[in-house]
Amino acid sequence: MLPLRLASLHKLCREIDTLSVPGDVVECGVYNGGSAALMASVCTRSLLNRSVWLFDSFEGLPEPTEKDGDKARACGWWCHGDLSKVRTIFQKLGVPESCIHIVKGWFQDTFPSVRTGDIALLHIDADWYESVKLCLERFYDSVQPGGFVVIDDYGHWEGCKKATDEFLRNRSLDVTLTRVDYTGRYFQKPLKPAQAQM
């Protein structure tokens, strides 16, 4: 992940505290834990007692489908994360184990059985169409008004963009996709009318 995207995640983790958005942080697609560690170092010190939920197979990415385009299917890069590296970086940063929930497995297998509760920030770094679609469908409704949804690969992978655009269109969500760099985007879940007037 490039520095601009890390800086943006750091800013958004602080912003959800400033706005007092309730809920935890959820990351789908952890790899070796760099962005997760950054978010955890901010959020676990929050007065709102946030936890960080991390979802990854740690066996690489699933194979892309036709909806991901030729570029994805030709890349041959499957991004195997290392769970031991994730645990090590948390230990080095002094992040309490009680604040971290690591869920190992494929999204379609783990999502149905896990209850995260309210979400203040959802970070999706899942690359492919089906994976991004699963993440949005499973967790968006738990994102609290004023919370943020971060899409890491919107500008790079065709399938990620397609899944995001379809979800926003199908839900009739009128949101602004804020550009972080050539690929990263995020949007804020609309505030309820009473919150917007505060």
Question: At which residue positions do the language-model features occur?
Answer:
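S-adenosylmethionine/decaboxylated-SAM
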Residues: P3, R14, L19-M198
